[in-house]
Amino acid sequence: MNGEPHLMSVMVPCLMKTVSGGQVRSIALGHPLLDDYLEFVAARARPNTLIAVAYDLKVFFTVIVKQPADITTADVLTFIKAQRAPRRGAGVLRLEDGEAGLSARTIKRRLASVSGLFGYLIARADAGVNANPVPRGLATRGRRGRAGVRGAPLIRAPRTLPRVLEPAEADAFVAALRTQRDRAMVAAMLLGGLRRCEVLGLRLPDLRPGERRVFVADGKGGRQRIVPISARFFSAVAAYYDSERPRTSSTETVFVVLKGPRRGQPLSAAGLDEIIEGARKRAGLTHLTCHQLRHTCFTRLREAGMALEAIQAQAGHASIESTRVYLHLANDWLAGEYLRAAEAIDAQSVRS
């Protein structure tokens, strides 16, 4: 392989990470070209994106043990087949997409990571890579036997609607929360639509109780926004600061650990997930995530008549296409719109 390291000896189970101040600053797989690409990604993407790309590449080159310049489209198709292989015993299918093995969304993400690597190597022009082995789709034939420019997607990811909480479920869940801190965090998601990472990233200067708004300094994709939020959130935060938050905590982060050796330190994502899971069980709910609280917030806002563009701004969506899902989730709003339109049509028919 012209002196290049053999990938089998490089793709070790653990990624090599450099952590500074709790954030991943760099990550490596031990192969020069792959590590150069990861440095390129690190300069342009967020730490979680970097980790995901590195893991996807690790998986790909563990399955396809070749140098990047030797990878072909046939290898990519072999990788897809391997990812579709059952992981939990023969004949086990995923309910959400009717396929065995990993979900279509996971495989599509991994293919995107691999495609990004080869796009980078092509641009470098010194890696011996002249074409991207990840095809955009499978060629199909047009009508009348002509070769069509259309392509069938390599992976079909089902478009599924996220589940939202019914009002009674939301009430039971909130009642099962044990501290003012927990009530404030849930209110941020359920009433303001904040993401989990945005809740955990809130600092005291970000809170604007007089305006009933919070400043999201580090949203998805690094985007900032100001989010209006219910007075119930600020009431819970005030009660949390008055009676629960350790006075000795020196961090500006709003939500901190209340007990144990990490008392006063910023609450972690795992810690918040544990809080949500405990309240879910006490409320007798079968399934609940932080993102489900966010979906519930925007669905209820849409049902209450909030414009789709306003929900997009509240959610921090880069594209309104991401927001359109709440048109389908807001069943009461959709039914009302249909009935109004149907009544107008019926009235026109009667007049004619």
Model regions: which residues?
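C-terminal secondary-structure termini that scaffold catalytic or DNA-interacting sites
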Residues: N2-G21, A341-S352
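N-terminal core-binding DNA-recognition domain of tyrosine recombinases/integrases
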Residues: L34-N48, Y55-G151
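Long, amphipathic, Lys/Arg-enriched alpha-helical "connector/arm" segment
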Residues: L93-E99, A147-Q180
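Basic, Lys/Arg- and aromatic-enriched nucleic-acid-binding interface segment
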Residues: R163, P167-R196, G221-R223, T248
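Conserved tyrosine-mediated DNA breakage-rejoining catalytic core shared by Y-recombinases
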Residues: C197, G201-S235, D242
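Catalytic-site neighborhood detector that most strongly recognizes the C-terminal catalytic loop/helix
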Residues: D218, A315, I320-R340
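Short, basic (Lys/Arg/His-rich) helix/loop patches that form interaction surfaces
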Residues: V227, D273-A313
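Active-site/catalytic core of tyrosine-dependent DNA strand-transfer enzymes
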Residues: A231-L285
